[in-house]
Amino acid sequence: MPPKKKKITAIIKLQINAGKATPAPPVGPALGQHGVNIMEFCKQYNAATESQAGNVVPVEITVYDDRSFTFVTKTPPAARLILKAAGVEKGSGTPHRDKVAKLTTAQIREIAQTKLPDLNATSIEAAEKIIAGTARSMGITVGE
């Protein structure tokens, strides 16, 4: 007889600093209400993301009915990568009036290549357009 498939009870999406997951909020309460071993998740997440220190790494945690879990790490949010490349703290409050920085097409291509697995795009050109649009909506000029 084949083994039974585990039943999924919850899918939790969090954004946590790489290598710095702790049982404190937001991680503890989100996992605790589903009965997941919080320390075990923190250890596994920190080990999986230690090479990306300094970035915020989104994670999708799948919780099963026997309280076990699996997780998938995603690429850092596009907005964070854009801000890092532009060298600014935050985007513009009025993006179409005040421009806060400028990105080259080479920088946009680099960010698009990083984000491609998580974007809803099949080609690098389409991914570049998505990233460029995000940058423009943050008040960052995209050009040569």
UniProtKB/Swiss-Prot annotation:
Record's CDD domains? Ribosomal_L11
GO CC term (a single one): cytosolic large ribosomal subunit
The record's section on Gene3D superfamilies has: Ribosomal protein L11, C-terminal domain (1.10.10.250), Ribosomal protein L11/L12, N-terminal domain (3.30.1550.10)
Q: How is it modified after translation?
A: One or more lysine residues are methylated.
- Has keyword Ribonucleoprotein? yes
Q: Does the keyword rRNA-binding apply?
A: yes
Query: What family is this?
Result: Belongs to the universal ribosomal protein uL11 family.
Q: Its biological function? A: Forms part of the ribosomal stalk which helps the ribosome interact with GTP-bound translation factors.
Quaternary context: Part of the ribosomal stalk of the 50S ribosomal subunit. Interacts with L10 and the large rRNA to form the base of the stalk. L10 forms an elongated spine to which L12 dimers bind in a sequential fashion forming a multimeric L10(L12)X complex.
Name of the featured protein: Large ribosomal subunit protein uL11
